[in-house]
Amino acid sequence: MNSVEKSLNTVADTAEIAPNNDFWARIASHVVADPDYQNRVYADWTASGRLFKPIEDRISNMVGGLMANTHTEDSYTGRVMTTWLHEAEQVIKQHVNASSEDILLNVGSGMTGALAKLIRMMGWWCHEQHRSIVLENMGQKPLVYITHREHHSNHTMWIESLVELRIIPALEGDEIDLEWLEKDLFNEKNRKIKMASITAASNVTGIETPYRRIAKIMHEHKAYCFVDFAASAPYVDIDMHPNDEEWLDAIFFSPHKFLGGPGSSGVLIFNKALYQNKVPEQPGGGTVLWTNPWGEHRFISNIEQRESGGTPGILQTIKTAMAVQLKEEMGTKNIYEREQYLNALLFNRIDKIDGVRVLSDNHKHRLSIFSIVFENVDYKTAVQRLSNDFHVETRGGCACAGTYGHHLLNIDYCTSKSITDQLDDEFQSLKPGWVRVSLHPCMSESEINTIADAIENVANGANAMFAAPEKTQSIWAPLI
């Protein structure tokens, strides 16, 4: 039984959990909402979290007044900001049970930048102009395994890197064929570099990947295991070192998906044994111990410093740590129980709506992510109607998971080729997809019913409940 199934076995069990409405209502009261449309329901949490007023206030009122660059401890403001930055880094490391051998880098704007950084540091990337030359001379490629559930950032990035990529086959019921993985690893026992780069949970269905078992399998075959926590990090425990067999060699996630997290950087944490570089991937200010006019220089030995060239994301890292702190104060046990309670409410409502189905609905225990297909309404129209006519914010498309979409929608090669040929000709309306609804534990039962009512109204072609929104007020009015 995996961690998403650890305490509940049926939806009926879930519905009996005390909802603890007062606690979650208090959390919700601090979420920054649309001032013009207070009744608008945000159900796109897997794409982005929302701002949390106590965090915004603390950054503005406490951090803002002392804002300064780091890279110095001689001045008071420089010393304070450097201290706060290091404290924030420790909060993040402790949250994932990183060891003293693990390196933390805050990179880009999400896990995409974090994974790109890892691939470049490992030397598995080059510019397309040089790709053919490099491949001709590099010898045996590293071998990378991914699952059929990956989103594009953990798929196409590997396709375009200097590795051989294999997708672990899917089994019936949307499961993952781990026996195939073990057999393939055995057959590749002479391959020098092997790794799995896998999602902890799907951003399409919310189904958890058995990444602990995969980590153990990979390590038994002297291979690495990298885990993408982009969809699940705001809601689940993350432990890089649970035991000697299931440790994680690298993890990456997107703190902007946390409540309170928008405006943060991507997070990459990896074991320093992976790092063999003499030259940082991005040389710059803060990476050198000294330089001189004759082209000589020496890089700092500390990996975290030498791989964080230029001014670090100071506010971004502090915000990440505060979002992590908020998650810990909410508690993953509370989050899990609330998720399953809200999931049961929404599943029970959707199951009764004709012309609507949830993808992989056999997996009831999941993160609060529902990808919905309307029989008689295309996903783009459905999302527009949900937003404009019923004030429910969702997301349409393939959720940047086209390969998984082929599996979920049973698209064979011939059908896929017909579609992609037309997409190449810019007929974007033919692109298959779904409507993704994603929830947060701080949402109320009333909001879940509003979402379900809106889905039913769209499926039935009901009239709009609200007038189309007016043009958004410009944020670029004069500031002074």
Label each residue range with its predicted role.
Residues M1-I480:
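Pyridoxal 5′-phosphate
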